A protein has these predicted regions:
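Short, glycine-/Ser/Thr-/acidic-enriched flexible segments
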Residues: 2-5, 12, 19-21, 45, ...
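Glycine-rich loop(s) and the adjacent beta-strand/alpha-helix scaffold that form part
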Residues: 3-72, 78
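Generic beta-strand/beta-sheet core signal
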Residues: 10, 16-17, 62-64, 93-94, ...
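Short Gly/Pro-enriched turn/cap motifs at secondary-structure boundaries
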Residues: 41-44, 79-82, 103, 114, ...
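An anion/pyrophosphate-binding glycine-rich loop and adjacent beta-alpha core
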Residues: 47, 51-53, 59-166
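A glycine-rich dinucleotide-binding beta-alpha-beta segment and adjacent secondary-structure elements
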Residues: 170-246
Length: 247
């Protein structure tokens, strides 16, 4: 309220302010337009201003495209990973079409979701048999209920599509194709492929649609440092008095 304070550093400045996961402009600049749709899983304060302040000093910025990703429901911060990382279910966009290989690890899968959908809004479509894996569906439903995070349930795929706002015709066709190909043991032939070694059909009511988006937890880029934690310039020479630590 009383204006800026100016501090004069006698021996140097240490930057330890985290990354830029919450800065949409920087994500777009360094990762691409799709990254604007990533949902925040980590701190809203990781906005990267101090990283950008090193640019006029000639700092070499490295690893600016790298980050850790994971699934999230952005409105409630519920985490659907327990089911999305299981051997059950398929992942579709709001158009009702499968959009990613479900066998991918959660970080890679979450990075792809905003690239293969227009709005980074998807659903895990699964059935009650998902509980065969350590009762994971019931555990997720209990947690989502505590967080007031919606999960849609129905006795038919058609009804499920209506409840979740998914394209009905496409979802019905996607589930039929998925079940047929999985039953034949030809999951890798799907587009996109399904490479789970023990794949399961979505065939036993009740059926569930669990919202999921790709989220960003932390970025890994920033000013490059040497073994003395000195920030270096584009020629890898130390910038006097400037140090950095962290991601």
């Amino acid at each position: 309220p009383n204006g800026f304070k100016i501090y004069w550093a006698e021996k140097g400045v240490m930057i330890a302010t985290g990354g830029f996961s919450a800065n949409e402009e920087m994500r777009t600049m360094y990762m691409g337009p799709w990254a604007a749709n990533l949902k925040i899983r980590g701190s809203l304060r990781n906005t990267g201003e101090n990283i950008m302040m090193t640019r006029p000093l000639g700092a070499k910025l490295v690893n600016m495209t790298e980050f850790y990703a994971g699934p999230i429901v952005p409105e409630t911060h519920a985490n659907p990973a327990r089911v999305s990382n299981s051997a059950y279910g398929m992942i579709v966009g709001k158009d009702g079409k499968r959009c990613v290989d479900e066998s991918l690890g959660q970080a890679m899968r979450s990075k792809l979701l905003p690239q293969v959908t227009p709005d980074n809004r998807t659903f895990i479509i699964c059935d009650i048999k998902t509980n065969d894996e350590d009762n994971i569906l019931t555990k997720l439903l209990d947690r989502f209920k505590r967080l007031n995070s919606p999960v849609y349930e129905a006795n038919t795929i058609e009804e499920l599509a209506d409840k979740a706002g998914i394209n009905k015709a496409n979802l019905v066709n996607s589930v039929k194709e998925f079940n047929k190909v999985i039953s034949e043991g030809k999951g890798p032939s799907l587009v996109p492929p399904h490479n789970r070694k023990k794949a399961h059909p979505v065939a036993t009511a009740p059926f569930y649609a669990i919202p999921m988006s790709g989220g960003i937890a932390a970025t890994f880029g920033g000013p490059k440092i040497n073994k003395h934690a000195q920030v270096v310039d584009v020629d890898d020479k130390p910038i006097p008095g400037l140090y950095a630590a962290g991601n």
